[in-house]
Amino acid sequence: MDRAILLLSVLSVGVSSQPITEGQRLFSIAVERVHNLHLLAQRLFSEFESSLQTEEQRQLNKIFLQDFCNSDYIISPIDKHETQRSSVLKLLSISYRLIESWEFPSRSLSVGPAARNQISPKLSELKTGILVLIGANQDGAEMFPDSSTLQLAPYGNYYQSLGADESLRRTYELLACFKKDMHKVETYLTVAKCRLSPEANCTL
C-alpha cells in the first residue's frame, strides 16, 4: 500500500513538472505585462473618479455608456463565446491592434507624469512581445486578415483646446476606454495562452 502511494506521488511529480515551452513562457510574460497595465488603468480611473462630485460621476458615466471608444472600430469578439471560438492568431492580432491604438492617446492621459511615463514603455514592450507571439503562431497566415487597411483616427478632437466641462469628459472617456481595452487584451491573451495547454479548461 505504501509503495503504491509512493509510486503515485512520483508519477504526480513527473506530470506536474513538465518543461515549460518557449511559447508558454512568452505568453506568461505578455499576460503578466497586460495584467499590470490593466491594474494601472483601473487605479488611474478610480483615482480620477473619486475626485469627482457624485453628480459629475453620474452624468459622465451616462454619457460614456452612450458613446464609443476609438478602439470600438477594431473588429473583435462580441462576447465570451466568440472569444473562445476565435483562433490564437486572431486573438493575438486583435490584441496587437488594441495596444497599438493606445500608443499615441496614452501620452495625453490626464494623469501624473510618473504614471504617464510608465504607460508608454509598457505599451511598447507589450506590443513587441505580442508581435513575437504572432510570428511564432503565424504559419504563413496573413497577420491581419480582417480589415487590414483599417486606420484609426487617434482621438482627433481630444487634442483640441476644450472648455472645463469638455476637458473633464475627455479625461473620463480616455481613462474609461483605456481600462476597458486593457481588460479586453488581458482576456484575449489569457485565452490564447490557455490554448497551449490542451488539458486546461479555457472557459471564461
From Swiss-Prot:
One Pfam family it belongs to: Hormone_1
Gene3D superfamilies with a match to the protein in the record: 1.20.1250.10
Compartment annotation: Secreted
Residue numbers carrying Pyrrolidone carboxylic acid: 18
Range of residues in the leader sequence: 1-17
The keyword rRNA-binding is annotated on this UniProt entry: no
Binding site for Zn(2+): 35, 186
GO molecular function ontology, one term from the record: growth hormone activity
One GO BP annotation of this record: animal organ development
SS bond partners: 69-177, 194-202
PROSITE patterns registered for this protein in UniProt: SOMATOTROPIN_1, SOMATOTROPIN_2
UniProt GO cellular component terms: extracellular space
Major subcellular site: secreted
Keywords assigned by UniProt, alphabetized: Disulfide bond, Hormone, Metal-binding, Pyrrolidone carboxylic acid, Secreted, Signal, Zinc
Record carries keyword Secreted: yes
Family, per entry: Belongs to the somatotropin/prolactin family.
Its job: Growth hormone plays an important role in growth control and is involved in the regulation of several anabolic processes. Implicated as an osmoregulatory substance important for seawater adaptation.
Record-given protein name: Somatotropin
Source organism of the structure: Dicentrarchus labrax (European seabass)
